[in-house]
């Protein structure tokens, strides 16, 4: 990671460094310059989620892009994967998303996609960062006659919905299927309901009234309880919860049980293997994946490899090893046969397609994987020293690992997008994992909080 760019772009509290209008303008300028080339009329797409600060950052980005002689196309509110798709399909030079994903509305972020729909490689992000931090842009500004223009794109949502529907097998139908959607008052609030309605489902929608401040507030993929209750109330077949920018998914079965991202991966990988679409017979998972996923895949005779947390690292391993599916327990799942990045709506469509193909309710499909007891505690931190350099923390981790032996594991890592440390413990019982996780979290808070 650089000084500005983390594992998922630039993030921070809106109107505070680095998420200021001035920084957004500079990111726009630097990004535009990176994609300019002689004899070409470049264009950059800009999309956002529903945060209040999105207006400020959007206009600043446009100013920066146009000041460098590049055209900006404003898409408006659309899920992050929608920008990835549109950037590629429209042959734009780059796409920029203004969002902080599952974070509260006070936060915002900027992430950038290349013209092929993939997130920018680290070296390009570092080059943009270098231009900004070392004030290299003033001498690069074009003449007034060469300034760029800004346009609004009115049919972006419709184009994206057409793409989404094409990921659902044409021979299947959702007629008579009851679906409940939790849109987190975020970027999916119009796209997701319209997509499932057009596929023939009976749709009930929750948290689809964004006001700029209510994104992710007690709703969405991190708070699926209301969705689960509504699925039971409606007698629905399935429920889907998205996060604020629509790149992750949490599913709820017809009995109100909440599935993890790992369970979704196991279900979809099994169907893909049966259809001969699981390339290299390989699934990419992360260090945060539940042990149960590895066990389930082994029983299915499916190979898996593990990588660092972060969808960009999952994607890198998928591309390097020829895998067609990979993801995180948090609900980021990448289907490379369909998309270049994690897409919550695409994932939901693949889950419901699996239900139709297998002819089983989601509760039965979920039995493919036993979820091992796991506790995760996030601790706000003021500093981020290497874990191995904090003696008290090293000692408590070692103590817990010795007590768990081969029946569990401990993972302590810093978040790549927020100032916090994540403590995860897996073990034989929920009581033990909670007890040990609290022990470690208390030390983290004392030493780093």
From Swiss-Prot:
<dbReference type="GO" id="GO:0006048">
    <property type="term" value="P:UDP-N-acetylglucosamine biosynthetic process"/>
</dbReference>
<feature type="modified residue" description="Phosphoserine">
    <location>
        <position position="101"/>
    </location>
</feature>
<keyword id="KW-0460">Magnesium</keyword>
<dbReference type="InterPro" id="IPR005845">
    <property type="entry name" value="A-D-PHexomutase_a/b/a-II"/>
</dbReference>
<protein>
    <recommendedName>
        <fullName>Phosphoglucosamine mutase</fullName>
        <ecNumber>5.4.2.10</ecNumber>
    </recommendedName>
</protein>
<feature type="active site" description="Phosphoserine intermediate">
    <location>
        <position position="101"/>
    </location>
</feature>
<keyword id="KW-0413">Isomerase</keyword>
<dbReference type="Pfam" id="PF02880">
    <property type="entry name" value="PGM_PMM_III"/>
</dbReference>
<dbReference type="InterPro" id="IPR005843">
    <property type="entry name" value="A-D-PHexomutase_C"/>
</dbReference>
<dbReference type="GO" id="GO:0004615">
    <property type="term" value="F:phosphomannomutase activity"/>
</dbReference>
<feature type="binding site">
    <location>
        <position position="245"/>
    </location>
    <ligand>
        <name>Mg(2+)</name>
    </ligand>
</feature>
<keyword id="KW-0597">Phosphoprotein</keyword>
<dbReference type="InterPro" id="IPR016066">
    <property type="entry name" value="A-D-PHexomutase_CS"/>
</dbReference>
<dbReference type="Pfam" id="PF00408">
    <property type="entry name" value="PGM_PMM_IV"/>
</dbReference>
<dbReference type="Pfam" id="PF02878">
    <property type="entry name" value="PGM_PMM_I"/>
</dbReference>
<comment type="function">
    <text>Catalyzes the conversion of glucosamine-6-phosphate to glucosamine-1-phosphate.</text>
</comment>
<dbReference type="Pfam" id="PF02879">
    <property type="entry name" value="PGM_PMM_II"/>
</dbReference>
<dbReference type="GO" id="GO:0008966">
    <property type="term" value="F:phosphoglucosamine mutase activity"/>
</dbReference>
<dbReference type="InterPro" id="IPR016055">
    <property type="entry name" value="A-D-PHexomutase_a/b/a-I/II/III"/>
</dbReference>
<dbReference type="InterPro" id="IPR050060">
    <property type="entry name" value="Phosphoglucosamine_mutase"/>
</dbReference>
<dbReference type="InterPro" id="IPR036900">
    <property type="entry name" value="A-D-PHexomutase_C_sf"/>
</dbReference>
<dbReference type="InterPro" id="IPR005841">
    <property type="entry name" value="Alpha-D-phosphohexomutase_SF"/>
</dbReference>
<dbReference type="GO" id="GO:0005975">
    <property type="term" value="P:carbohydrate metabolic process"/>
</dbReference>
<feature type="binding site">
    <location>
        <position position="243"/>
    </location>
    <ligand>
        <name>Mg(2+)</name>
    </ligand>
</feature>
<comment type="similarity">
    <text>Belongs to the phosphohexose mutase family.</text>
</comment>
<feature type="binding site" description="via phosphate group">
    <location>
        <position position="101"/>
    </location>
    <ligand>
        <name>Mg(2+)</name>
    </ligand>
</feature>
<dbReference type="GO" id="GO:0005829">
    <property type="term" value="C:cytosol"/>
</dbReference>
<dbReference type="InterPro" id="IPR005844">
    <property type="entry name" value="A-D-PHexomutase_a/b/a-I"/>
</dbReference>
<dbReference type="InterPro" id="IPR005846">
    <property type="entry name" value="A-D-PHexomutase_a/b/a-III"/>
</dbReference>
<feature type="binding site">
    <location>
        <position position="247"/>
    </location>
    <ligand>
        <name>Mg(2+)</name>
    </ligand>
</feature>
<dbReference type="InterPro" id="IPR006352">
    <property type="entry name" value="GlmM_bact"/>
</dbReference>
<keyword id="KW-0479">Metal-binding</keyword>
<dbReference type="GO" id="GO:0000287">
    <property type="term" value="F:magnesium ion binding"/>
</dbReference>
<dbReference type="GO" id="GO:0009252">
    <property type="term" value="P:peptidoglycan biosynthetic process"/>
</dbReference>
């Amino acid at each position: 990671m650089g000084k500005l760019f983390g594992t998922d772009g630039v993030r921070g509290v809106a109107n505070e460094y680095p998420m200021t209008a001035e920084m957004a303008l500079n990111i726009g300028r630097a990004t535009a310059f990176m994609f300019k080339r002689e004899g070409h009329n470049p264009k950059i797409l800009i999309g956002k989620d529903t945060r209040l600060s999105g207006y400020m950052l959007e206009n600043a980005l446009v100013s920066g892009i146009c000041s460098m002689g590049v055209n900006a196309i404003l898409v408006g509110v659309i899920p992050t994967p929608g920008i990835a798709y549109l950037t590629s399909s429209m042959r734009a030079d780059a796409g920029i998303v203004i969002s902080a994903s599952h974070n509260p509305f006070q936060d915002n972020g900027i992430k950038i996609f290349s013209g092929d729909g993939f997130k920018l490689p680290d070296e390009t992000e570092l080059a943009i960062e270098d231009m900004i931090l070392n004030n290299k842009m003033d001498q690069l500004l074009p003449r007034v006659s060469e300034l760029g223009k800004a346009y609004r794109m009115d049919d972006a949502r419709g184009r994206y919905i057409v793409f989404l529907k094409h990921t659902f097998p044409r021979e299947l139908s959702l007629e008579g299927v009851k679906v409940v959607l939790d849109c987190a008052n975020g970027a999916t609030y119009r796209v997701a309901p319209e997509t499932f309605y057009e596929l023939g489902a009976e749709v009930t929608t929750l948290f689809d009234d964004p006001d700029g401040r209510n994104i992710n507030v007690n709703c969405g993929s991190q708070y699926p309880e209301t969705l689960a209750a509504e699925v039971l109330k409606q007698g629905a077949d399935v429920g889907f919860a998205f996060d604020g920018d629509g790149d992750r998914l949490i599913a709820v079965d017809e009995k109100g049980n909440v599935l993890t991202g790992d369970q979704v991966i196991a279900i979809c990988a099994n169907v893909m293997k049966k259809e001969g679409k699981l390339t290299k017979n390989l699934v990419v998972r992360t260090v945060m994946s539940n042990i149960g996923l590895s066990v389930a895949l082994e029983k299915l005779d499916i190979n898996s490899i593990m990588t660092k947390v972060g969808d960009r690292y999952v994607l890198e391993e998928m591309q390097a090893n020829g895998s067609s599916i990979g993801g995180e327990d948090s609900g980021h799942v990448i289907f490379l046969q369909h998309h270049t990045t994690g897409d919550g709506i695409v994932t939901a469509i693949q889950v419901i397609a699996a239900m139709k193909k297998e002819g089983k309710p989601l509760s039965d499909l979920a039995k493919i994987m036993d979820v091992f007891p796991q506790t995760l505690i996030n601790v706000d931190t003021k500093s981020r020293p290497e874990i191995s350099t904090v003696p008290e923390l090293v000692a408590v981790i070692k103590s817990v690992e010795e007590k768990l032996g081969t029946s569990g594991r401990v993972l302590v890592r810093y978040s790549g997008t927020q100032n916090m440390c994540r403590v995860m413990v897996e073990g034989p019982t929920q009581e033990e994992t909670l007890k040990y996780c609290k022990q470690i979290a208390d030390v983290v808070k004392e030493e780093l909080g």
